[in-house]
A protein has these predicted regions:
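Structured, hydrophobic secondary-structure cores that serve as assembly/anchoring elements
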Residues: 1-167
Length: 167
C-alpha cells in the first residue's frame, strides 16, 4: 500500500521530540509535503487517537484544535480539514508509518485473476449447510515512481507521506 511505495516521503521527528509521540509540527510538515492534499486522507493506528485528539495549533495564550470530531453518525473525524480513519495495518505509535497521509487518487489497483467462486455441500454436511468460497487476486501501487521537485522549490512532494520512527 501507501507505506511500501518507493517514493514515500518520511517526515523526521522534531529535535527533542519524545519517543512514541505525535506533535503539531509533524502534522504541519506532512501536510506541506503531500501532493494533492485536497484529495488526501489520514490513516492512523488506533493507539494514536488520544494524541491526535489533543493536538492544538498554539495562537497566543490559546490555541485551535487540529482534530475535529464528527458531528454526524457515519461521517469521518477530521484532522487538519481532511478525513481521518483508524487503520489496523498502521504500525504502533512511534514506529514509522503510524500516521499516514495519502492521496489515494494517485494509487492504481488492478486485478490479475478474475473472480473465482466455488461451493460445497460436503464441508458442513452434518449441519445441513452449503459453503461458498470466493477468490480474487489483485495488486496496487502508486502511479508515481519518485517524489516531485517543484520548479521553484527544493522541497519534494509526493502523494504519500508518513512520520519516521520516533525513538
Amino acid at each position: 500500500g501507501g507505506l511500501n511505495t518507493p517514493g514515500l516521503i518520511s517526515v523526521t521527528a522534531e529535535t527533542g521530540q519524545d519517543a512514541d509521540t505525535i506533535v503539531y509540527e509533524n502534522i504541519i510538515k506532512m501536510r506541506s509535503r503531500c501532493w494533492g492534499y485536497g484529495n488526501a486522507v489520514w490513516l492512523y493506528n488506533q493507539d494514536a487517537l488520544p494524541q491526535l485528539m489533543q493536538l492544538v495549533m498554539a495562537i497566543g495564550t490559546s490555541g485551535v484544535p487540529m482534530w475535529q470530531n464528527s458531528a454526524r453518525e457515519g461521517e469521518p473525524d477530521m484532522l487538519l480539514g481532511r478525513p481521518a480513519f483508524p487503520c489496523e495495518y498502521c504500525p504502533t505509535v512511534g514506529d514509522a508509518g503510524d500516521l499516514l497521509l495519502g492521496n489515494w487518487s494517485q494509487y492504481l489497483e488492478g486485478s490479475y485473476q478474475p473472480l473465482q467462486s466455488g461451493e460445497s455441500v460436503h464441508v458442513r454436511f452434518i449441519y445441513n449447510e452449503r459453503t461458498f468460497r470466493f477468490t480474487m487476486r489483485n495488486d496496487g501501487r502508486c502511479w508515481w515512481r519518485a517524489a516531485l521537485t517543484p520548479a521553484v522549490s527544493t522541497t519534494t512532494l509526493f502523494p504519500f507521506v508518513a512520520i519516521a520512527a520516533r525513538t
